[in-house]
Amino acid sequence: MEFRDHLVREGLSVNTVTFYLSKLRAVYNRAVREGFAPKGTDPFESVHFRVEKTRKLAVDDTVLRSVAGAELPRGSLAVARDLFMASVYCRGMAFVDMAYLRPRDIEGDVIRYRRRKVGQPLTVKIIPPLRAILDRYGEICSPFALPILMVRDGKGGFRPFEVSGSDPAGKRRSEQEQYKQYLDNRSDFLRLLRRLSRQLGLERNLTFNMARHTWASRARREGIPMAVISEALGHTSEKTTRIYLDELEARRIDEANDIVTSFWDDAERKKPSSAPAGKRLSEL
């Protein structure tokens, strides 16, 4: 299927490709039901829809503190760090949503925006470190809220890449050029995060997906219900959230099993007078 191959070439993950194809199939099926498309010719018949478990992407508190507290000179590396932390502070806001965020989306102490991927409206409280980042770049990147959709201005600096065009065709071309610039800038920021990871001596390279997974994992560790985490991330179902957290849940189960079965290799526990030691299951 050409569209699927196009999405893969764009670098989208298997899960994201499956998401877009399933939405397209739903539109096609509705068109068939309402008589806008012929029956008996299903273009999705040979397309296999699958969802992969994501590898561990969350980072621990030590890494977060190291990244947030790193003393960096003004420049692109500091911008990349600020964008990573902004995503964490915004409940794991997706990079594409940060790119298109505008000052009008900021109302007092909250950010109100709609996820570009699923159209889900979200409201995020602005905490002090997030406010500091927004204030730092507000004037530089207006009419955007964060310095992602930027392009060199030919004078040694950068300017926002705004959509232009006086007619629909011209505006459409400009939007396509803007999106291409977004993809190029996303690649640049990922390279900067890899460089920052090496500089800080991190075991794994940071990515913006890590910020999203980290928020979800920390929330789950704090005992926040799955339904709340799912809504906070803007997922349309808890199934997607569970993909994020499967590895964390598996680790908690392993820890529980270690506690339950620890008597096998603890001779002291076999004595009648021995009291159970270690963590309680309720503490996991």
PLM features: what roles do these ranges have?
Residues 24, 96-99, 229:
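Alpha-helix N-cap/helix-start motif at helix boundaries, enriched for small hydrophobics
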Residues 39-95, 99:
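Basic, Lys/Arg- and aromatic-enriched nucleic-acid-binding interface segment
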Residues 46, 100-136, 151-152:
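Conserved tyrosine-mediated DNA breakage-rejoining catalytic core shared by Y-recombinases
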Residues 58, 115-119, 233-258:
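Catalytic-site neighborhood detector that most strongly recognizes the C-terminal catalytic loop/helix
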Residues 69-75, 190-231:
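Short, basic (Lys/Arg/His-rich) helix/loop patches that form interaction surfaces
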Residues 104-110, 203-204, 224-243, 271-279:
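Short, polar N-cap/turn motifs at the start of nucleic acid-interacting alpha helices
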Residues 142, 148-176, 258-284:
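C-terminal secondary-structure termini that scaffold catalytic or DNA-interacting sites
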